Amino acid sequence: MGKFQFSKQTHNIIHLKRSWQRPVPRHETLHKNMKKVMFLLAVGVMCLTACAQKKGGERGTRQGGHMVINKDSDSTFVALKNETLKKFKQLTFNDTQTGKTMEYNLLVPEGAEAGEELPLVLFMADASTAGKEVTAPLTQGYGALEFASDRDQQKHPSFVLVPQYTDWAVQDDWSTTDEVEMTIRLLEKVCKEYNVDTNRLYTTGQSMGGMMSFYFNITHPDLFAASLFVSSQWDTTKMKDFGRKHFFYIVAGGDQKASGGMKDLAEVLKENNARVDSTSWSAKLPSEEQERLAEELIAKGGNINFIKWEAGSVLPESGKGMEHMASFDYGYKIAAVRDWLFKQSKE
């Protein structure tokens, strides 16, 4: 068979094609590579956001550990902040056991100087406030401020103790830093210095703070008269005796880690023959309706109360954000829950 020959027309086409296969200029290559990098970064951010939403709790939001929801447009919150911030002193605790210091906020109620023993609320914020100014746990949301409000202080005069943490105090593997037990020593110091009714100590916190409240109920089982756990969870294998405790546990249905913790605790309590009263409603209901529903739950007379916000209801109308962080304030806005807390006593 003879040698294959290109036709003249085919040869010209190949020559023309090769003439267009010029080297790509470097600036075009860099531009294409940059577009690829930007695309991969965008995909990575989307994956991290989805992962954080799925994980919920403190570890799940660590990528946004210093993210704080701006509430300047919430006129009710701004008014509450203006009403209450001036009531707090900013102080420093020197811990002789560790040699470390801890900054904290303290509200001393009217009547305390007259010798009357009054209850104390220990409020611990989430990790978004860690490492910031001492007042960050106050200004981040409704939590501590509701207990300091004129309404609450007139109805339930109480000390309000709000520590500030330098870093994440607890982790999702249940490990803790020195600042966790430092908090208890700070509490003991305040109780010695002021006329605190030690039969009416209450612990509460959101996310990291709620995890610490769970931890304290395990490691110091007889210290607190009652607790309010918000958007948090802990190792339920250590909670077999929680049936004898008095607490409210409030989470968002779409916060998978916290709602999962609630489910796990319910199972542990059931296995140990403890009674749990629970309910669920939309966080978008009018406040009057939410108060009524909370009072119906309390009227059942149980010592353990669960509230789960319907999934998605804690999010803004846009539907954007994470249910974990968006749920914090809702847990503290219910006056009936706070009133119930102050009725609990170890006596």
Task: Give the predicted meaning of each segment.
Residues G111-E116, V170-S207:
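Gly/Ser-rich "nucleophile elbow"/oxyanion-hole loop immediately N-terminal to the catalytic nucleophile
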Residues C51-L120, T204, M211, L265-E267, ...:
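A domain-start/cap signature at the N-terminus of enzymes
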Residues M1, Q5-R59:
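Bacterial Sec-dependent N-terminal signal peptides
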Residues Y249-V251:
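Short beta-strand/loop motif that positions the catalytic acidic residue
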Residues T139-R151, V230-M239, Q290-L293:
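Alpha-helical scaffolding within the catalytic cores
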Residues L120, A127-E181:
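Active-site machinery of serine-nucleophile hydrolases
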Residues G253-S259, R275-E347:
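C-terminal catalytic histidine-bearing segment of alpha/beta-hydrolase fold enzymes
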Residues K192-E193, N199-G243:
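Primarily recognizes the serine-hydrolase "nucleophile elbow" in alpha/beta-hydrolase
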